[in-house]
Curated annotation (Swiss-Prot):
Gene3D superfamilies: 3.40.50.1400. This is Ferrochelatase. Keywords: Cytoplasm, Heme biosynthesis, Iron, Lyase, Metal-binding, Porphyrin biosynthesis. Its EC number is 4.98.1.1. Pfam families: Ferrochelatase. It is found in: Cytoplasm. Fe cation binds at H202, E283. GO terms for molecular function: ferrochelatase activity; metal ion binding. InterPro entries: Ferrochelatase, Ferrochelatase_AS, Ferrochelatase_C, Ferrochelatase_N. Its main location: cytoplasm.
Amino acid sequence: MSFEQKPKVTVILANLGTPDEATVPAVRRFLKQFLSDPRVIEIPKFIWWIILNLFVLPFRPKRVAHAYASVWSTDSPMREIVFEQTQRVQAYLERENKQFDLTVLPAMTYGNPGIDAVLEKLSAHPQEHVILLPLFPQYSATSTAPLYDAFAKWIPTQRNLPGLTIIKDYYQHPMFIQALAESVLAYQEQHGKPEKLLMSFHGIPQPYADKGDPYADRCRITAKLVAEALHLKDVEWAISFQSRFGKQEWVKPYTDQLLQDWAKQGVKSVQVLSPAFSADCLETLEELAIQNAELFQQAGGGSYAYIPALNSDQAHIDLLAGLVQANLDALTHTLAHR
């Protein structure tokens, strides 16, 4: 590379993933890839192979495909949002970084565009530096770590390796907390303030937390900081964890049980925020917004509303781009002094 050429830098925005279509075969392929990852399911491989192939994949894809169809438009909501986030972060960073030949790419851990395929593309175009931003605000071995694994698999295949930065998470970043709080206030300005604000996060099995996964603790910190930013009293909000899978104990309290308890206690209005999600997806649009609303109301509760994820809100784009920009500033300094 000549000295006149701008250093190539690629930024990867990576989310969990989504099926290619809202069909049973596509959902089955996606679930097989996702649920075959030992980071996600920590059960002895042979035992889990039997459970997955004989009891999960023959039955679960039909129900999940039906759920996807209820939220699908021209594409998966998550993929559409991640693509828009990528375009807007690229535009932001290009304005601020004329010194780099800079590209921002979307990637998914499972499904398309897959992280392995994205890394393979980089092999054909040597990079000065790669910055990975997992779109998981709270690190977990079940979500963020598989992206580390993808890089660990790719690195030994490369001769001219780039510099590499992985932004582990941002669960208590001031811009993140402010963006969440502002999204709640904006929603409540239009729809009113509820009796209870529930911050519901995707759950993980309790044994994972017992073994050192920091996810649940980081979720609790995020929730506490958002509540403080909103000046909420302890009785006005709570934290919970959704999407239990299997018979294992998961981190508590469980979202579905808490909503039923509130309904029985006479709570008449609830709004739900899910700060673990950077983009709305099946879990937020179908489970949180629809299933849990029915659960709460059937148990005797009244008004229930889901507050959308940050998605492509300007405050969210500013946060994501700002996280990357801090690393680009450090890279600029490094390149100027080497």
